């Protein structure tokens, strides 16, 4: 057993102090764009991501106004103007002056009504029993909702859908937050809205906004690949749209105030992105450097240097999976080995920046310094830098907040280092993951203020997938709205003598509470067939003991899962509540699938698991 002490309050505070940051220009290795989009979603990815009572997220609209419009309505210095200009640069296309002016006029009107609504809500907060204050708030809410419906059309103008996509995603984000706010206000103000109608509208708009963003992201990516074989341009589009569009829509699921009626520890954004390559861009447009694998935490590096000129010739990454007692995993070799090597394991802190020194003559790396959040520097080199004129210095990081906040609260941490090409001076790539994704799978029941809290764990943070018979479990690329990779279970009917086909998704947990706690568990998934108690099903075990059944339902037809929509995924709860022991790392959650081959259908049976959520019993 791991004797590491689990301090509940300390764990709950992990990644919880996320303030809205002022908009700054930031650099993605040569790509300059605004960080305001990320500032908008930061309050929604910490421990206190979703607050179930008036206050907190109910006030998120007012809190976001100075982020989106830092200089007020009269200035073009606003989020929407910035993201439109950024997208023009990425796509190397211009939005017509007419479309821009039309959108900005609409935005000015939207800002005025947003501020108009904010003032009314501020007044109501101080006069909650005043019927006139309530009536005024209702009226202004209704006007703002109508204004959003009318305004969304201006962010999807024909022939400009891709160029306007980040602006559309941010407007959709604000509209859904407003609709969510209305549902929450209805809990404390009688008949504030027509609840059933309003909730259906919330769900419809959410689905519509996700579909639009997913469709036009794909079309934009296809379009840019048809125009160029330049990896830099393609990577810039992918990184920028992931950060400014897909990350936003991936959080829309959590805006539902009925499903998320408690504070929630979100770990949605497991999707990784690349900063610009160092040295030459990869030669092959169709390389796929993002592996569809289980999540791993970078723990160290082994670097190899040439015997004579001491330039970097190769390296290996070292990882640990989410089981903290497991051995360090040795990654693939990039380049080639020598007898000159440096091997170092990082501490439990995360790497937020890499400083690289490149020989100006050999055009090869001679020194790597990895910087972590505990002020440590990990130097991988076999030479001292004495004549700075002989070398070029590059600082590689992916941070979308103020440059002054890079170390204090980086938006992304290093996930993996890559190399492409046959020579040591070919392309080096650095892969990054969002800072909300913790290395382990902590399970909470309450936050530091003793409020119940929902814990979300992506299926991709399993430590192991195991198969029995003809069933296959594997990590695959998730749809645009899930936030990252997902787990696919597939099995086909084959004539053999196997008595059973099966598979297990193994998820290690660290429980962070002082007494045994019971949880309801729900799973977000898609499936092309139904659970059947007699010969098809899924169950949950804890340390090999059966604790609950997962009765999944068919959500889509056919065997093609490559283009599933948001409406093809759903939550279902396990039948039983599950008790977990307190303060231990000796808990393994196993989601097991089983099929009797004699009763399989003729088509491939598919279940796709995105995330598992744990809701403590009050």
Curated annotation (Swiss-Prot):
GO MF annotation list: signaling receptor binding; toxin activity
Coiled-coil regions listed in the entry: none
InterPro entries: Galactose-bd-like_sf, Pest_crys, Pest_crys_dom-III, Pest_crys_dom_I, Pest_crys_N_sf, Pest_cryst_cen_dom_sf, Pest_cryst_dom_II
GO CC annotations, alphabetized: extracellular region
Coarse class of the protein's main subcellular location: secreted
A Pfam family of this chain: Endotoxin_N
Disulfide bonds listed in the record: none
Keywords from the UniProt entry: Secreted, Sporulation, Toxin, Virulence
Gene Ontology annotations of biological process type: sporulation resulting in formation of a cellular spore; symbiont-mediated killing of host cell
Subcellular location: Secreted
PANTHER family for the chain: ENDOTOXIN_N DOMAIN-CONTAINING PROTEIN-RELATED, PESTICIDAL CRYSTAL PROTEIN N-TERMINAL DOMAIN-CONTAINING PROTEIN
Family: Belongs to the delta endotoxin family.
Function summary: Not significantly toxic to mosquito larvae. May increase the toxicity of the Pesticidal crystal-like protein cry16Aa (Cbm71).
Protein name: Pesticidal crystal-like protein Cry17Aa
